Amino acid sequence: MSEDQYKQIKLHLGMEDDNEDLPNHIPSSFPKQHLNKIYNGDTMNMLLDIPDNSVDLVVTSPPYNINKFKNDRRPLEEYLKWQTEIIEQCHRVLKPSGSIFWQVGTYVNDSGAHIPLDIRFFPIFESLGMFPRNRIVWVRPHGLHANKKFAGRHETILWFTKTPEYKFFLDPIRVPQKYANKKHYKGDKKGELSGDPLGKNPGDVWAFRNVRHNHEEDTIHPTQYPEDMIERIVLSTTEPNDIVLDPFIGMGTTASVAKNLNRYFYGAEIEKEYVDIAYQILSGEPDENNNFPNLKTLRQYCEKNGIIDPSQYTFTRQRKGSKPSLDSKAHPEEHHKKEIVERIEFEAENSVYKKVQNEQ
């Protein structure tokens, strides 16, 4: 990354003059030099440099013992010990009003046994005296192919708070009512809307589409989560100018969301290539070869600059020989819920039980 590109990134993030002009509402306990930065190195080293009670939200998706350790797979107990040490530090730096969202999947051991990690992580948070708020199920329309088991189509997000007094804002994350105009038909409220006009609580089953090769946010990172899912978490548990920490920030999804929602971010990523790409996404600019890390960054750049024909640019996940199209956009959660419902209805209509009934 060139010096000019780095200056452009700093300008985009309001990081000029080494953060000397940051607003004075930032808590003095949090080092200003860390705000809106991605630490390239071990996450424990980053965490040890953060003061107690200085972060408003911790949200992350730790490596599930794959990809990050190359060919050096850790035994489950060793992996959990390492994660416990990280979580202890996250608890220490979290403000009393703060939340931790820890997205976990499944650990597959050498014999092929699938162990859901949420049941192993729950006691870790509980041992720190944290308060469980939700076990969120993230359902995806599509999962990995499987021949000897049911295909996995969900992961879990554990939400814990440090104290019983925590931040939570429902209105910014409400979703449309199923029957938006439904009214009370009797009683004192007859004729009034039966539901909240702002929408309903989204519940603890989320249907955000997983980031894959046909998703506009897709980069070279193997386990990327969608921005709209992190947006829901940030909006519901923080306020503008709060500090969001991601100890495994990867390609900077959490950083992008925090920046777009006027929050400060800090995170760690051990892979230098991922850090460079994260900063490029944050800058919204092409590299020296007119390439973007993903389709979304390219589309936003063209929309911002009034570019109709993007043929002079490329993006990393672009298919060979194809021209970039600006039409592809990520669908909202409601779209994916509809996909899931339609799939369930299709399976019900074509079930073996239904066929047997029809034959009788």
UniProtKB/Swiss-Prot annotation:
Residues covered by region (Disordered): 316-341
Enzyme superclass (EC): transferase
EC number: 2.1.1.113
Gene Ontology CC annotations of this record: cytoplasm
GO terms classed as biological process: DNA restriction-modification system; methylation
Record-linked PROSITE patterns: N4_MTASE (PS00093)
Keyword Zinc found: no
Gene Ontology molecular function: DNA binding; N-methyltransferase activity; site-specific DNA-methyltransferase (adenine-specific) activity; site-specific DNA-methyltransferase (cytosine-N4-specific) activity
Keyword Transferase: yes
InterPro entries found in the cross-reference section: DNA_methylase_N4/N6, MeTrfase_CN4_CS, RM_Methyltransferase, SAM-dependent_MTases_sf
Biased composition (Basic and acidic residues): 326-341
Record-linked Gene3D superfamilies: Vaccinia Virus protein VP39
Catalysed reaction equations from the record: a 2'-deoxycytidine in DNA + S-adenosyl-L-methionine = an N(4)-methyl-2'-deoxycytidine in DNA + S-adenosyl-L-homocysteine + H(+)
Entry keyword set: DNA-binding, Methyltransferase, Restriction system, S-adenosyl-L-methionine, Transferase
A Pfam family assignment: N6_N4_Mtase
PANTHER family: RNA METHYLASE-RELATED, TRNA (GUANINE(10)-N2)-METHYLTRANSFERASE HOMOLOG
Family per similarity comment: Belongs to the N(4)/N(6)-methyltransferase family. N(4) subfamily.
Protein name as catalogued: Type II methyltransferase M.BglII
Lineage: Bacteria, Bacillati, Bacillota, Bacilli, Bacillales
Gene: bglIIM
